Amino acid sequence: MGWEYAQVHLKYTIPFGVVLAAVYRPLMSRLDVFKLVFLITVSFFWVVKGLEANSCRLLLFLPCMLILRGVLLRLTNADSPWDSYLIKNRIWTYPPGVVVGLTAWDIPAEELFFFVIQTFNTSLLYMILSKPTFHPIYLSKKTGWGKIAGQILFASAIIFGLVSVSSGGEGMYMGLILIWACPFLLFLWSISYQFIVNLPWTNTALPIALPTLYLWVVDTFALRRGTWSITSGTKYGVVLWDGLEIEEAVFFLLTNTLIVFGLIACDNNLAILDTFPEHFPRTKGVPSLLTIIRTLILPKEKYDEERIQGLVSAVALLRKKSRSFYLASGTFEGRLRIDLIRLYAFCRAADDLVDEAPSVDDSRASIEKLRKFLDLAYEENQEEPSQRLREYVTSSIPEMFHMALLQLPTYYLPKQPLDDLLKGFDTDLLFDRKSGAFPIETTEDLDIYGSRVAGTVAELCNHLILYHTPEAVPEDIQREVVASGQEMGIALQYVNIARDIKTDAEIDRVYLPLSWLKEAQLTPEDVIQQPHGPTIEALRHKLLDRAFEKYNMAKGAIDKLPSEGKGPIRVAVESYMEIGRVLREKGPTMKKGRATVPKMRRIRVAWSALNK
């Protein structure tokens, strides 16, 4: 009996897992918990009970389990007998004084735990790196040569492995590794290769490379110390570096590839499920295995390419116009994230359609076109835009905005907030420096304006959260959440105005109420001419005081949101209010005339918000 192998876990694998778990815990969703707990629990069940026949029947009835099987393989009965075979035939050996002595199928308990901790660590690393990724935009109908090339590669590896095992000798261990891992890699590649090659390298190569390199180093220490060893005559004798056999290097590379490919396949199926509601009606919470199977067998020819391209356009717009919102949207999941992106893309497109018009008259015409669009969309009251609505948009709206309008989820959003948003645009067009027209006369006017341009968006976001949540939320709580969202939106708009006094002055707009200016013995022209100084700073602080007053009144309702929206909304709110806190401090970091929050401070704020 010994503790040397256990110390490998205590020194290297467990601390790594603890750090990853601590980093990802605030972002952990029900679906993430399901993936981890389900994989490890079911794997242990199979290992402890040794239900080889039952696991085979599960795979026959549930093909989607093969996706998970790639992650679980080292813990399933396809793996445990394989490990047992290696140990019984002394391909792998463990000196008697390095393990505690507990075994299953002659496999030391420490080795079984290693299978668990590797899956846990690599899975968490993948989840951390892929969290910001918006998976639906990586779906594609196209089938290229890459699929066949990958299939040939993995099939060739299987054949090479079979030949090596049948020949015995020095290629035995490498052959066993290849015939154990490559059939599942072939399967996972065949069903998800487009996703694998289309995703950013930070979602594919990086979560494979980092744990592989880490385990190569750990394995080197263990092999040098004799914690475990590979028997001569079953290995090639080639080392990647001193102390690391080539077979061990390939083994860890393939196991981490299995885990990551399996998780990518899961995300591929979830993206299909979330992106195509015409094939998969409204779903809430963790999807059933039967539903996942249906996504697996859906022909790519049935993908709605227009919907995919609409989401691609929406993401491109947000990355250009509001990267912070796009990144914040990564804390949401599934169809809720899709609809929030579609909603915000519409708001940005509508704003650009009005602001970028060549004249005030053209801007007013754009607002009327948007009103007509909303009237038609809500008159038809259907999920997918009709041919009539499409014809109106294509004939009246510039092409770059078509997708943003046609993908607005009007079917389950109220119309009034969108109408009010357009009224806010109307207010913006009333500013006229030449005639002395400045429409924000009183505090109440500013509240109304803030409610229209920001409170409406917050209200619509809350409607989407309540629509998509699997939780039952009482109607009185729903009303409170929506009303508080309106107030919070006004608070955020106050911060926005406080930040942009100089920027707005450059386009001859002054959103400070005329009543406030009169008390300070200023005119709008004074602000336009000199948008800084002690008096302006005093007015800025007055805006911020009112912003934080409304924020403090409304923030309690965030805790009453469903769990899917609580943390992400808190991050969005706190990140924006932090701009107000920076403005209150001396010497804010300025960028293009605006106060900005330093990057590390933004990270701390988001982390704190998620951990509340």
From Swiss-Prot:
Task: List the CDD domains hit by this protein, alphabetically.
Answer: Trans_IPPS_HH
Which pathway does this chain act in? Carotenoid biosynthesis; beta-carotene biosynthesis; Carotenoid biosynthesis; phytoene biosynthesis; all-trans-phytoene from geranylgeranyl diphosphate: step 1/1
Which InterPro entries does the entry mention? Isoprenoid_synthase_dom_sf, Lycopene_cyclase_dom, Squ/phyt_synthse, Squalene/phytoene_synthase_CS, Trans_IPPS_bact-type, Trans_IPPS_HH
Induction of expression: Induced by light.
A cellular component term from Gene Ontology for this protein is: membrane
Segments carrying the region annotation (Lycopene beta-cyclase) are 1-268
| Annotated segments matching region Phytoene synthase | 275-612
Concerning SUPFAM superfamilies, the annotation shows: Terpenoid synthases (SSF48576)
Signal peptide span: none
- For this protein, the Enzyme Commission number is 5.5.1.19, 2.5.1.32
Keywords assigned by UniProt, alphabetized: Carotenoid biosynthesis, Isomerase, Membrane, Multifunctional enzyme, Transferase, Transmembrane, Transmembrane helix
| Reaction catalyzed | all-trans-lycopene = gamma-carotene; gamma-carotene = all-trans-beta-carotene; 2 (2E,6E,10E)-geranylgeranyl diphosphate = 15-cis-phytoene + 2 diphosphate
How does the entry describe its membrane topology? Multi-pass membrane protein
Molecular function (GO) terms for this protein are: 15-cis-phytoene synthase activity; geranylgeranyl diphosphate synthase activity; intramolecular lyase activity; lycopene beta cyclase activity; squalene synthase [NAD(P)H] activity
Give a yes or no for keyword Phosphoprotein in this entry.
no
Biological process according to GO: carotene biosynthetic process; carotenoid biosynthetic process
Q: Where in the cell is it found?
A: Membrane
What does this gene product do? Bifunctional enzyme; part of the car gene cluster that mediates the biosynthesis of neurosporaxanthin, a carboxylic apocarotenoid acting as an essential protective pigments and leading to orange pigmentation. CarAR catalyzes the first step of the pathway by converting geranylgeranyl diphosphate to phytoene, as well as the later cyclization step that transforms the carB product lycopene into gamma-carotene. CarAR also converts part of gamma-carotene into beta-carotene. Neurosporaxanthin is synthesized from geranyl-geranyl pyrophosphate (GGPP) through several enzymatic activities.
Give the similarity note: In the N-terminal section; belongs to the lycopene beta-cyclase family. In the C-terminal section; belongs to the phytoene/squalene synthase family.
How is this protein named in the record?
A: Bifunctional lycopene cyclase/phytoene synthase
* Source species of the chain: Fusarium fujikuroi (Bakanae and foot rot disease fungus)
Quote the gene name from the UniProt entry: carRA
